[in-house]
Swiss-Prot record:
GO terms for molecular function: DNA binding. Homodimer. The keyword DNA-binding applies. Belongs to the YbaB/EbfC family. Transmembrane segments: none annotated. This is Nucleoid-associated protein CYB_2894. It is found in: Cytoplasm, Nucleoid. Binds to DNA and alters its conformation. May be involved in regulation of gene expression, nucleoid organization and DNA protection.
Length: 111
């Protein structure tokens, strides 16, 4: 704890914690970009892979699914995409909570 600086010490401490969060956010951003999260539909016949930022990376179709109607294939693709997006968004939310969950900014009424 910084002593002898009154409110300036609290501000300095808050700035240090803000820098820690920023550094952690940069690490998290890189980690999210490198993640691969797979959403599936049709018991794995259709797979959509996204990264931790919900950016699509790959679509995989089992040849068996191509025997289905266009409507069925579209529904399976949409289901797999939503599944992948949901998992990715939840992963991002949890990781952000881990990053910011223990942050308190003393004297600023924010933590």
């Amino acid at each position: 704890m910084t002593r002898g600086f009154g409110p300036f010490g609290k501000i300095q401490e808050a700035l240090k914690k803000a820098q820690e969060v920023r550094d952690g956010a940069q690490r998290l951003q890189k980690e999210l970009e490198e993640m691969e999260i797979v959403g599936e539909a049709g018991n794995g016949l259709v797979k959509v892979t996204v990264n931790g930022n919900q950016e699509p990376l790959k679509v995989s179709l089992d040849p068996q699914v191509l025997q289905e109607s266009v409507d069925v294939v579209e529904d399976l693709l949409l289901t797999a995409m939503v599944n992948a997006y949901t998992q990715s968004a939840e992963t991002m939310r949890k990781r952000m909570e881990e990053l910011t969950g223990n942050i308190s900014l003393p004297g600023l009424g924010l933590g």
